[in-house]
């Protein structure tokens, strides 16, 4: 994580690191951590699995203007290098601030598929997608509706693309298709008897997502779910522990949201009480409304 001092004319930062080492005799493994700038010049070096780096006149990771330091970890014979962008994110009233400056999201609910490969990874198409986004003056996308490949996340770090990172929880909503029918019994989405296992699995998905993507500068917000039955009875009790878990796990304490299905309203949708940012799905020109966008 980075603690950035914006009070100076040239911001400075303190990077706090914690290296988790697993395996046989991990307690006896010596750990060395080095910090390099983007040109490869070593700025600092320290020993131990926990510590800090101080950077004066820090180069910030900015939307569409990325700067990535390199953190090199040597643990025994293993070496791992992490590109790391220094930036801050917070919500202040109606403003979404990146590096203490208001940010306006211009982009898409994207999908990670291509004509030649389907859901298979295609690195040139990833590069093409980002190039088209920049040509259209877009600056961001949501990973609708699943975590994207690590290669795409690294590319967004490098290109300064802002990402709303979403779990695989799409359509936690038994009202789709006329409602669920279990042996002739209609039940609600968050029926306490049937929904416990779903919530526990949902927690696992959040843990996996944040564990993998927590160090990506491009990720500025976590999306807990897409199009859930968030206005239904029991929705608040289902989602509040999930928001609490995400906020607990994320060392950067990024904002959290869920993206509501069209038709829900702020007075009934539980996300209006839980989310740092209200996100709404609107399908004009996609499912209905003709070609005018």
Regions from the PLM with identified roles:
Residues 1-163, 205, 218-221, 237-248, ...:
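Secreted/periplasmic carbohydrate-active enzymes, especially glycoside hydrolases
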Residues 130-132, 140-293:
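Substrate-binding/catalytic cleft of secreted carbohydrate-active enzymes
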């Amino acid at each position: 994580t980075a603690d950035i001092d914006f009070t100076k004319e040239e911001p400075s930062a303190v990077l706090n690191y914690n290296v988790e080492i697993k395996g046989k005799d991990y307690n006896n493994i010596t750990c060395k951590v080095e910090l390099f700038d983007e040109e490869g010049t070593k700025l600092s070096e320290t020993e131990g699995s926990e510590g800090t780096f101080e950077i004066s006149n820090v180069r910030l990771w900015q939307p569409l203007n990325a700067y990535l330091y390199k953190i090199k970890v040597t643990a025994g014979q293993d070496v791992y290098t992490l590109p790391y962008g220094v930036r801050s994110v917070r919500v202040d009233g109606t403003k979404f601030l990146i590096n203490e400056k208001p940010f306006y999201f211009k982009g898409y609910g994207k999908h990670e598929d291509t004509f030649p490969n389907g859901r298979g990874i295609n690195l040139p198409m990833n590069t093409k997608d980002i190039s088209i986004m920049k040509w259209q003056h877009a600056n961001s996308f949501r990973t609708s509706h699943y975590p994207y490949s690590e290669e795409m996340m690294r590319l967004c770090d490098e290109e300064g693309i802002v990402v709303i990172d979403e779990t695989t929880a799409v359509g936690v909503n038994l009202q789709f298709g006329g409602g669920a029918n279990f042996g002739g019994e209609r039940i609600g989405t968050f029926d306490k008897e049937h929904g416990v296992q779903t919530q526990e699995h949902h927690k696992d998905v959040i843990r996996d997502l944040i564990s993998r993507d927590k160090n990506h500068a491009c990720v500025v917000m976590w999306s807990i779910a897409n199009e859930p039955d968030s206005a239904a009875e029991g929705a608040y009790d289902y989602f509040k522990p999930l928001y609490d878990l995400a906020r607990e796990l994320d060392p950067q304490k990024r904002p959290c949201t869920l993206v509501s299905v069209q038709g829900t309203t702020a007075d009934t949708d539980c996300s209006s009480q839980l989310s740092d940012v209200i996100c709404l799905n609107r399908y004009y020109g996609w499912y209905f409304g003709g070609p005018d966008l």
